[in-house]
From Swiss-Prot:
One of its GO terms (molecular function) is structural constituent of ribosome. GO terms for biological process: translation. The keyword Ribonucleoprotein applies. It comes from Ehrlichia canis (strain Jake). PANTHER family: 50S RIBOSOMAL PROTEIN L9. Binds to the 23S rRNA. The gene is rplI. Residues 161-208 are annotated as: Disordered. This is Large ribosomal subunit protein bL9. Residues 186-197 have a biased composition (Polar residues). Belongs to the bacterial ribosomal protein bL9 family. The lineage of its organism: Bacteria, Pseudomonadati, Pseudomonadota, Alphaproteobacteria, Rickettsiales.
Length: 208
């Protein structure tokens, strides 16, 4: 285990300025991503001064995350996977898969900052959480389909939902388009050969 000082809050580890121990592999990730510094004698001695620097950098990162959130709010994801007749996938969809999808769209989000609360093992509609900053998590919609027809239906479904929400917002519901899409995103999946109602019985936080 290696001792580090967190430069920003990290889920399941602690807040900025906390000294903690992690496995070498995770430490390398945190150091490379500039989320932490080594807990050397010099860094520990200057922890108060380090904390002021950490706070300033954290505010800068939060502003950058807010800008990224604005560009991501209209995004949704579609991934094609082979599946059985009952919609069960041959395999599963992982945070690494989501990171690749986002990378293809021009967004660099590490898979460790992507999480969801159920194992994705069926064709259907899901919510994926993107941790853009420890204080800013953005949920976006993911459609898991098994063919091009399913992808077309997912695009149509998403467009219809957005039009519906836009109309409700115009009528004064008080909820933004993107907020409503996230709230509805797991409740109205369509049942076709391409996109089926999902079976989400497992509730662990999946991080891979």
């Amino acid at each position: 285990m290696l001792s580090i000082i967190l430069k920003e809050s990290v889920r399941n580890l602690g807040k900025a300025g906390v000294v903690t121990k992690v496995k070498p592999g995770y430490a390398r990730y945190l150091l490379t991503q500039k989320k932490a510094v080594r807990a050397t004698k010099e860094n520990l001695k200057n922890l108060e001064e380090q904390y002021l620097v950490i706070e300033r950098e954290n505010l800068e990162k939060l502003e950058a995350a807010k800008a990224l959130k604005l560009s991501l709010e209209d995004e949704f994801l579609i991934i094609t996977r082979q599946a059985a007749d009952d919609g069960k996938l041959f395999g599963s969809v992982t945070p690494k898969c989501i990171s690749k999808l986002l990378s293809d769209k021009g967004y660099n989000i590490h898979y460790r900052n992507i999480f969801f609360y159920s194992v994705i093992k069926y064709i259907g509609e899901y919510v994926v959480n993107l941790e853009l900053h420890p204080d800013l998590v953005l949920p976006i919609t993911l459609y898991v389909v098994k063919n091009d027809l399913g992808a077309m239906q997912a695009q149509k479904l998403h467009a219809e939902k957005k039009r519906k929400i836009e109309k409700e917002v115009e009528e004064g519901s008080g909820t933004s388009v993107d907020e409503s899409l996230k709230l509805d995103s797991v409740s109205d999946s369509i049942d076709t050969s391409g996109v089926n109602s999902s079976d989400k019985e497992e509730e662990n936080n999946i991080i891979e």
